[in-house]
Amino acid sequence: MNKPESNLNSVNPPNLRSTIVAASAMPWQPTQFEGIEMKILYSDDEGRSTILFKMAPGSVVPLHEHTALEQTFILEGSLEDAEGSCGAGDFVWRPGGNIHVAHAPRGATFLAIFNRPNRFFDGTKFFTSAE
């Protein structure tokens, strides 16, 4: 965040100041799913997280349940499931209880915001869960 004026000072104490994440400088990390990489931009002990994902063409996120609201903004490519397809510039949100399989036939890059970790039916842990 650039300061519009050089004499501006934060009025917030250190624990309430903005945290700037240089996402473009972060390396992509592998996930437990083939062809899917991520950058965890935010996560907390209550299960909230913001994750940038990159899915290779043909990659799949297997059957899972959203245990709380999940919001996704598609930056590149497209994501598909049984309920439809969303492409670059589209926003999709899913309520808690939504169950689906997501796939990216042509690849996709997207930002996802989770209020709680997903539950994978094959027992796989969520992206931010410790192994």
Which role fits each region the language model picked out?
Residues 56-57, 66-81, 88:
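Glycine- and acidic-residue-biased ligand/ion/polar-headgroup-sensing regions
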Residues 96-121:
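Ligand-binding loop in jelly-roll beta-barrel domains
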